[in-house]
UniProtKB/Swiss-Prot annotation:
Region (Disordered) location: 105-136
Organism for this UniProt entry: Homo sapiens (Human)
Gene name, Swiss-Prot/TrEMBL: STPG3
Protein name: Protein STPG3
GO cellular component, as recorded: cytoskeleton
Compositional bias of kind Polar residues: 107-118
Length: 386
């Protein structure tokens, strides 16, 4: 097989032998140069050998292109000098060039000047339009849209010249129209904190007017007046860990699993229920805590307190439960039975340190116990157990 150089030599040799014409089809014949005229006709004759001129049919005049026209005249005046057929003449004719010569071909383009961060240049455009992307790539891809190069054969990262990573100081924040100031809600200013959110969530600080200076206020005071964008460490997380209301509700309509399980374990200390038949059906069944019983659960000496009537109240943690009944009984709903006044017993049994024992912090509920059994049993219209 011949290589490209041998094929080129053979092509030029055939072009020189054929008189400066390319071979297209069939055998090339040596013909004389034919002058061209504005308009002429050629006589196409095909007589058989030995036949006279008069015996032949009348000649047919056919119009041919300008480049292949002969001299004008009658058949007697101008003898035929071109003996090729019409098919051979059309095969040698070249089609006109319809392409625009001013437009560069796909394989012809101007090589751009090589960039500092690239080791090989690439064309400005390939098939489509040039992508107007931001400068970036490699270690400088802070604000670039595409990390890949425009050409699939080159890469933007040149680690031989980029020896240092950019610092966070090179990063520029986007303009205000580039990102929304809020998402589904209004923009919450970090420098404004509601008064109800500044109270400490501690029992001793309730009602004393103590306020907390959150970290967001300190960070907001250090910022410049023109900048309003808070940093990631300037958000106030204290309001989410406290009650949003200044005081707890008097009663709750929800069913807490912890409260339901606490009520369902009524008198489950290992001793029999002293009054199982006196509790009304659908009433409120409460459980006496461990501090209200003498001895240990399961022992023979374990018995209910019989020294005096005991009043138990379930109030939220942090309230003073040692006052008279008229002071802490204001949270009862309308129609709830009231205990007799003058009972100075602690509202809830306390541990040795004096801290009220309260398991869940639920609404105010009363329970009275005397020597003969429950003096009165609160009966709500709608039982929380049903």
């Amino acid at each position: 097989m011949m290589n490209s150089d041998q094929k080129a030599v053979k092509f030029l040799a055939n072009f020189y032998i054929n008189g400066g014409k390319h071979w297209t089809h069939g055998h090339l014949r040596q013909t004389q140069p034919e002058p061209t005229q504005p308009k002429a006709s050629v006589l196409l004759l095909g007589p058989e050998p030995g036949m006279a001129w008069d015996e032949t049919q009348p000649p047919k005049m056919k119009e041919i292109p300008v480049g292949l026209r002969l001299q004008t005249g009658t058949p007697q005046e101008s003898l035929p000098t071109y003996t090729q057929t019409l098919r051979e003449l059309l095969l040698e004719q070249r089609p006109l060039i319809t392409a625009d010569l001013e437009v560069p071909s796909p394989t012809r383009y101007q090589v751009p000047s090589p960039s500092v961060r690239e080791s090989s240049p690439h064309p400005h455009y390939s098939i489509g339009c040039k992508h107007q992307g931001r400068e970036g790539g490699g270690r400088r891809a802070w604000q670039t849209l595409w990390f890949q190069s425009e050409s699939p054969f080159t890469q933007k990262a040149d680690f031989d010249q980029e020896q240092k990573w950019p610092s966070p100081a090179h990063y520029q924040l986007l303009s205000r129209p580039a990102f929304p100031a809020f998402s589904f809600r209004g923009c919450h200013s970090a420098s404004k904190t509601p008064e109800g959110h500044t109270h400490l969530g501690l029992p001793g600080a309730r009602g004393l007017g103590l306020r907390v200076q959150p970290q967001s206020l300190l960070q907001a005071s250090l910022q410049a007046p023109g900048k309003r964008c808070p940093g990631p460490n300037t958000y106030n997380i204290l309001p989410g860990s406290r009650l949003q209301s200044p005081r707890s509700p008097a009663f709750s309509m929800s069913r807490s699993p912890a409260f339901t399980s606490w009520l369902s374990t009524s008198f489950s200390f290992g001793s029999p229920n002293p009054w199982p038949s006196r509790l009304p059906r659908g009433g409120l069944q409460l459980t006496l805590p461990f501090g209200a019983w003498r001895g240990h659960p399961g022992c023979t000496q374990t018995q209910a307190p019989r020294h005096r009537p005991l009043l138990h109240a379930l109030e939220p943690a942090g309230h003073n439960l040692l006052g008279p009944a008229t002071e802490w009984n204001h949270g009862l709903p309308r129609g709830f039975p009231r205990p007799p006044l003058g009972l100075g017993a602690p509202a809830w049994p306390s541990d040795p340190l004096g801290t009220p024992m309260h398991p869940s912090g639920w609404p105010t509920l009363l329970w009275a116990v005397d020597k003969a059994g429950p003096a009165w049993i609160p009966h709500l219209p709608i039982s929380p157990l049903h």
